[in-house]
Amino acid sequence: MEKLLSLYQEHIKTLQNRTRDALSRHHLDNVLIHSGEPIGVFLDDSDYPFKVNAHFKAWVPVTDVPHCWLLVDGVNKPKFWFYSPVDYWHSVEALPSSYWTHEIELIHLKNVDDIQKELAPFINKNTAYIGPNTQRADSLGVSLDNVNNQSLLNYYHYYRAYKTGYELACMREAQKMAVNGHIAAREAFQAELSEFDINMAYLMATGHRDTDVPYGNIVALNEHAAVLHYTKLDHQSPDEYRSFLIDAGAEYNGYAADITRTYSAKENHEFTALVKDMNDAQQALIATMKAGVRYSEYHIQMHQRIAGLLHKYGIVKGISEEEMVSEGLTTPFLPHGLGHALGLQVHDAGGFMQDDKGTHLAAPAMYPFLRCTRIVEPGMVLTIEPGFYFIDSLLAPWREGKYRSHFDWHLIEHFKPFGGIRIEDNIIIHDNKIENMTRDLHLA
């Protein structure tokens, strides 16, 4: 805890420095950051699970309390209004007392609407608001031009790519939780449990509820692995176990882990060998990574490796690996991007930004679903998650195209019952090395 305290103190200094610079550039006095408000279910008296504003949890590790407020100006100690009402209907969070509370000015907010008079001395025409409720900002007297001002958001989003020591420490803790879940899920798969029960084993091991994980767990058996974001969770076990893909994370102090593994249930099958080769290809790509290279270059290099596997297994024949890539023959097998920035959000902000003004560099036309085009730099946390799938809807156009004779359609049918493969690690870019948080915890 003592180490986390010193890291948090430096983290707050970094956020204060960024805020001071942002306010100066945008001619603002302060920024009001709203944790958010519950969203009610239509024609019902219940709410959807609360998800906190990412800009809020960047400052304080409070992720499950609505109606909280931060006022920051880059100079004075951040003011934190913590909502803790008297309520016998619902559980109420007590005022926090932890290593981080000494770095902010903690103020008890007993009633939601009391924030009006609490903030009155601080709100002026040069106050910005970052949060989900425009009407609430208006009621507090914030100028509409300063509500989620895009230029201000661009500034914050750009620098969010560079993680502080505190953020990296939190992300390493999230990795530990997620790895525990992945080990439990693998054992549940080996015990031939259903997707639903595998997911329960994962949640138990991480100490999370379904609403706590940073994204809906993808727990896919057999051909379900061909659905990139499969979240159905069958209660019934399949008649035959062929493959298992799990894409699941965890969260610590608001920071996410995002890990994927694929397993084969068949010892002597080409799919088992393909999983191993994909794992080797992913590790080989990471071994080449370094600061100063554009992320999209690594995405293209992964497609070259996919072409090599298509050639090795005879899935695509009679065409060079170079032409496979240039003509897009690898894209139905790897339809998504190599990965993305990771942090306060799973797909963290600023992946396309080339500067703090928000200059946008789109993904290459051939790879429209790539989520990051930035130069890889020290302090960044990225996912590396190549895939290799057998998806009918993506392969269908190639059955009729000019390259149709180069595909071994019989072999593709042979692989289809296994769905596909995705292998994902979370890495930190350092000056002279790549830290693989996932592999450092010995998750094979």
Curated annotation (Swiss-Prot):
EC numbers:
3.4.13.9
Record keywords, A-Z: Dipeptidase, Hydrolase, Manganese, Metal-binding, Metalloprotease, Protease
Record field: catalytic activity:
Xaa-L-Pro dipeptide + H2O = an L-alpha-amino acid + L-proline
**Residues given in the record as Mn(2+) 1 binding sites:** D258, H340, E385, E424
Q: Which GO terms describe its molecular function?
A: aminopeptidase activity; metal ion binding; metalloexopeptidase activity; phosphoric triester hydrolase activity; proline dipeptidase activity
Q: Any binding details for the cofactor?
A: Binds 2 manganese ions per subunit.
Q: Which cofactor does it need?
A: Mn(2+)
Residues that hold Mn(2+) 2 according to the record: D247, D258, E424
Keyword set includes Cell membrane = no
Highest taxon listed in the record's lineage = Bacteria
Q: One Pfam match, by short name? A: Peptidase_M24
Instruction: Name its GO BP terms in alphabetical order.
Output: proteolysis
What is the enzyme's main class?
hydrolase
The job of this chain, per UniProt, is described as: Splits dipeptides with a prolyl residue in the C-terminal position.
Q: Which family does it belong to?
A: Belongs to the peptidase M24B family. Bacterial-type prolidase subfamily.
Q: What is the recorded name of this protein?
A: Xaa-Pro dipeptidase
